Amino acid sequence: MEAATTLHPGPRPALPLGGPGPLGEFLPPPECPVFEPSWEEFADPFAFIHKIRPIAEQTGICKVRPPPDWQPPFACDVDKLHFTPRIQRLNELEAQTRVKLNFLDQIAKYWELQGSTLKIPHVERKILDLFQLNKLVAEEGGFAVVCKDRKWTKIATKMGFAPGKAVGSHIRGHYERILNPYNLFLSGDSLRCLQKPNLTTDTKDKEYKPHDIPQRQSVQPSETCPPARRAKRMRAEAMNIKIEPEETTEARTHNLRRRMGCPTPKCENEKEMKSSIKQEPIERKDYIVENEKEKPKSRSKKATNAVDLYVCLLCGSGNDEDRLLLCDGCDDSYHTFCLIPPLHDVPKGDWRCPKCLAQECSKPQEAFGFEQAARDYTLRTFGEMADAFKSDYFNMPVHMVPTELVEKEFWRLVSTIEEDVTVEYGADIASKEFGSGFPVRDGKIKLSPEEEEYLDSGWNLNNMPVMEQSVLAHITADICGMKLPWLYVGMCFSSFCWHIEDHWSYSINYLHWGEPKTWYGVPGYAAEQLENVMKKLAPELFVSQPDLLHQLVTIMNPNTLMTHEVPVYRTNQCAGEFVITFPRAYHSGFNQGFNFAEAVNFCTVDWLPLGRQCVEHYRLLHRYCVFSHDEMICKMASKADVLDVVVASTVQKDMAIMIEDEKALRETVRKLGVIDSERMDFELLPDDERQCVKCKTTCFMSAISCSCKPGLLVCLHHVKELCSCPPYKYKLRYRYTLDDLYPMMNALKLRAESYNEWALNVNEALEAKINKKKSLVSFKALIEESEMKKFPDNDLLRHLRLVTQDAEKCASVAQQLLNGKRQTRYRSGGGKSQNQLTVNELRQFVTQLYALPCVLSQTPLLKDLLNRVEDFQQHSQKLLSEETPSAAELQDLLDVSFEFDVELPQLAEMRIRLEQARWLEEVQQACLDPSSLTLDDMRRLIDLGVGLAPYSAVEKAMARLQELLTVSEHWDDKAKSLLKARPRHSLNSLATAVKEIEEIPAYLPNGAALKDSVQRARDWLQDVEGLQAGGRVPVLDTLIELVTRGRSIPVHLNSLPRLETLVAEVQAWKECAVNTFLTENSPYSLLEVLCPRCDIGLLGLKRKQRKLKEPLPNGKKKSTKLESLSDLERALTESKETASAMATLGEARLREMEALQSLRLANEGKLLSPLQDVDIKICLCQKAPAAPMIQCELCRDAFHTSCVAVPSISQGLRIWLCPHCRRSEKPPLEKILPLLASLQRIRVRLPEGDALRYMIERTVNWQHRAQQLLSSGNLKFVQDRVGSGLLYSRWQASAGQVSDTNKVSQPPGTTSFSLPDDWDNRTSYLHSPFSTGRSCIPLHGVSPEVNELLMEAQLLQVSLPEIQELYQTLLAKPSPAQQTDRSSPVRPSSEKNDCCRGKRDGINSLERKLKRRLEREGLSSERWERVKKMRTPKKKKIKLSHPKDMNNFKLERERSYELVRSAETHSLPSDTSYSEQEDSEDEDAICPAVSCLQPEGDEVDWVQCDGSCNQWFHQVCVGVSPEMAEKEDYICVRCTVKDAPSRK
């Protein structure tokens, strides 16, 4: 990169960047408006700009963000685009800074011409601002006045120095030595003895150019430029600039500027210029201008005789030759002490006399402008340079530098003279030459189908200036500078200065890509204000450049403008955003970094009046016009038939003004004497050939020319400025006559007339007063007329549509408000509905309705609604002012509010108060019923209360509720701990806690559980006491239920351990009973073994069916169903006393006996059936009979020896029972009686105990009957029949098969006693293919009584000696004597009588016992006789030879027992014959039972032992029911045990 274009950021400045500038840290101006149009709005750019114009005009600039999907492709060829940027030194841009630099340049030039070296002094470690010092001294009256009045301290204070440090004297010395000689020179005091030179003489041949920055428009790129750099901040040293001898004056001036940290002035011979910069250390001397200390410079004498030629021009003397100075400009001589002010020493450099110095310093400076860089860039190379510069300057990546930091640093740099930062700006690159960034037709960039839409987009800057709505489209002259876009490639700090667009037109700028561009804008109405402020603050700049602000070379800090009340706005334009500037809106800005932008001018119809005003302004400034405004108007008027009616109307108005002005000017010219005229086609001339010589205005309508100056023209405003010839020699050149202009204007008028009439009607309708307003229908008619006549969619029509739409919306809203319907009573979230108005908005809406340009029918109705809403507000306010309003009243008022579709401010508070009132009522209601007030209810109420707005009543209720909850939770937790306490608490302590809990007005779950536990404990104790006090033996289930209940009660119960022990004893007793009775792995339960069988045969089912058919006798309760063990167990459990249990078991015994008898007969019959009956099913397997088989002694069914276990031959013959019939071990009675005794000691009733008692009673009863049978003669008769071969077996056994079938030592089915050895030998066998290993006593071989006795013997689960004795007696062989006796005819009769007598004795004994009982119970003699009569026929039934006879006998016996039971049932205590004394004796008698229950009252029933002791026992103590006591003999346990050995 060449040195001329290299950018040197220099040392990094310290941050924050407040800088030493006059304004301190930069404060950003307010933001300008930012618009984000919808797609519909974005479709027409001119319509959108017209829409936003009222807003954006107030700020001068605005930003437009296109819709997000609008992203035009970048159409520039990046590789082929190249440009030469402009060089910008930032501190030369700012107006006030440039004034300072110019002043310092003049001071430097003055001292340079005086041959002295200039040092910039430092005061208080700060560089002295010579410009400010000079200005302040001048404001105070000058050097002499300040010294006289001693104002140096005041001046030092104004310059920012601290007072009291003798700074004033230092400043005075610096001023006196540096500035005072210069001011004396300017005032002319140094030339008072000389004739002042004419400063206005032409000195072009010696012209001095201190800046060498020609105007921007005429600068040519130089081959080389001095390297730009950032000067270091001057800290504590002054800069001493030495001028080398070989350097020219211009070079020294250049170096002087560089040493002062100022922009370097350029010289004409800059190509060979070299700069030498040196910083010298601080010198403590106060003086600033230092003369040469070496050999004083004097005029060297060329010849000895020429000395007299040099004399002082002031004093005329040639003396003091060594003090005589020779001017290097004019060779005049002066004494150093004759000069004003005098010089102490001879300068070391070239010296100019006051005359030459005045001539040099009076030369005007050339206009300031930008110079072009020497290097040509492409986008790529410029971007690399720009990014490197910004990254190095801020020492961070470019994208991380905040825009605020860049902005503050920019304004600091442009305001300081100490730092020289130079940047480059690729500005004003013609898109015509390099292509636009937007796609264009026939462009080099190929577009996708989606991107082709951008070719015709109105926002494509190539299209916007030439669109139909743009006025510039009608200009045929070549104004490509305004109609074609310009490209701008920026870098960090590159800027564009304050300016307005040509002809005060609009401009639009689009940032294609890159970093943001910061804009500042001033609205058009403040343009002259900005100009005046800048002229006031920097008047020196406008002396040489009156049109400075049109040159785009001057910038001023926005804060400075805002301080002088100039409105300034800013924005950051990001990539993809537009910035629009409005007519006459000054704007400036800078780039944040490398970016690419494109801009173009355009003019809308509303600009036309401003455009004419701008031309007049240009005429005053003598500024060139880009095009002729009048020519444009006439061009548009010439094609009035195709103009838009709005454009035609506007052009017609502007043309009328033009014609009037032209008519007046031509009349003025005519009065001056100009009479010659000629038509001239001005549009055919180049613009520079038809410009007014005076004001530079482009002439079109007319001009004045003179033959003395051919080719020169003046406008009619400056006729007198053409030449000195008399006016009659002038010639008026015109384009149109007035007669030509009027038809053109009328054509425009005709084109716009219908529209104007319509527009007039629209304006009248829009601006009508209240009493003259039209209806909404009239507005719609105007819109329909515009559509029918195809008027343009201009601002007026859009405004009419907008007003109509607003009116329609207002009508719709008004109707909705009048309907007064809300969708919901309460909206979620509590927020304001978007469709609802507040009362204030309603009031404003009503006001808006009255302010509408049209009249709505809903307006008066809505006014009435507003009145009703205001009444509601008054009532609601009154209700809300009450301390405790009722919920009902609040709800009623809220219901009224639902009629209004208005957001009422009171509703929120009313709903809050309603919630509070409802909550308070809910709390009050909950507290009225403490039993239903749970902890969760209290917590819920508290949670609801917490969510309520603060209110005193709520807070009080909350406090009470919280206190109640705290107490309740405390006691509930305490109750819970009491319930879970181990060991458990006593009933008294828990009852005390319950009393405390009952005082709490709330429902406590654990408290309720504690209360329930206490109540359950009391009930339990009451039940236990009742059980103990009743005198009854407790039932096991009752005890278990009590124990279970007691264990579940969390209270310490004293009786519970005793009951648990009792239940444990019962369980132990049951375990002992199980071990005694049940076999190993028995499928039967203990109760099932002890109770009579309920699962025998099918008799149960038959009896059930028969009972269903038999009606119950009147007055009798239905008997308990005993068809299964569960029925029997339930009946035993439900029985309240032992007697009823025994009766139940007795009934079960009868069922068992009957069912088994039927089963035995059926099985016997099955075995006696014909052989060909193949349906016979036997055995456990229920298959057909097959030898070998064995027959069960009890059920008489046959079983295959392969299916069951049978005894071996070695074991002898034993009674065999099948698995169904053998249910227990059948322990001997001696093992059972201790169980009964221990059960009586336990004194607990349980089904198994009742069953055991009944089984023992049944066993003892069977023993008694068996003993009677054995002692009677009836058994002999049976024995004879058995022995005589009446007993037979159908099947014959095979000994070998039996022995091989079973080898078990003791099969489960065998009994514990043996049969006679000759049992099989005495049996007659029939030949049959079936045979059994054992034969049973045939049923028809014995009497029914014996058969029943034998059957019941096997049913008994007890081993008795009488059973074996009975079988041995029946199956023993008769002796010969017995056989002889049996053959005797008399013996049998005798034996029979004996037998009958024995039997009769037994019966008499029973009758005596029965009679004794009946007498004791007071039975009448008649009833006893009836009983005796019923029992007497038994004598006839002694001989029982058939089962039918046996059944008749049983029925008769049961009838007698039933009579006894009936007599017992009907003998109530009131009918008894006992006296009260006897009753008391019975009650006081002692029961000898081991575990006497000591019953009282109705339970004192007695039974006498029929054994040897004859003692009386309580029936309930020995487990005997009244029925059993009447039907059977009772032998106590002691007699049973005592008599058992004798019976053996």
Curated annotation (Swiss-Prot):
Residues 32-73 form the JmjN domain. Changing residue 499 to Y: Abolishes lysine-specific histone demethylase activity. GO terms for molecular function: DNA binding; histone binding; histone demethylase activity; histone H3K4 demethylase activity; histone H3K4me/H3K4me2/H3K4me3 demethylase activity; nucleic acid binding; sequence-specific double-stranded DNA binding; transcription corepressor activity. 2-oxoglutarate binds at residues 425, 507, 509, 517. Fe cation binds at residues 499, 501, 587. Binds 1 Fe(2+) ion per subunit. One of its GO terms (cellular component) is nucleoplasm. Residues 202-214, 1389-1400 have a biased composition (Basic and acidic residues). A zinc finger (C5HC2) spans 692-744. Ubiquitously expressed, with highest levels in testis. Down-regulated in melanoma and glioblastoma. Up-regulated in breast cancer (at protein level). Residues 201-230, 1374-1400 are annotated as: Disordered. Residues 1376-1387 have a biased composition (Polar residues). It is found in: Nucleus. Its EC number is 1.14.11.67. GO terms for biological process: branching involved in mammary gland duct morphogenesis; cellular response to fibroblast growth factor stimulus; cellular response to leukemia inhibitory factor; chromatin remodeling; lens fiber cell differentiation; mammary duct terminal end bud growth; negative regulation of DNA-templated transcription; positive regulation of gene expression. The modification Phosphoserine is found at residues 986, 1328, 1456. A zinc finger (PHD-type) spans 309-359, 1176-1224, 1484-1538. Its cofactor is Fe(2+). The modification N6-acetyllysine is found at residue 832. Several specific inhibitors are being developed and tested. The inhibitor KDOAM-25 inhibits its demethylase activity, resulting to cell cycle arrest in myeloma cells. Histone demethylase that demethylates 'Lys-4' of histone H3, thereby playing a central role in histone code. Does not demethylate histone H3 'Lys-9' or H3 'Lys-27'. Demethylates trimethylated, dimethylated and monomethylated H3 'Lys-4'. Acts as a transcriptional corepressor for FOXG1B and PAX9. Favors the proliferation of breast cancer cells by repressing tumor suppressor genes such as BRCA1 and HOXA5. In contrast, may act as a tumor suppressor for melanoma. Represses the CLOCK-BMAL1 heterodimer-mediated transcriptional activation of the core clock component PER2. Both the JmjC domain and the JmjN domain are required for enzymatic activity. However ARID and PHD-type 1 domain are not required for activity per se but contributed to recognition of the H3(1-21)K4me2 substrate peptide. The 2 first PHD-type zinc finger domains are required for transcription repression activity. Belongs to the JARID1 histone demethylase family. This is Lysine-specific demethylase 5B. It comes from Homo sapiens (Human).
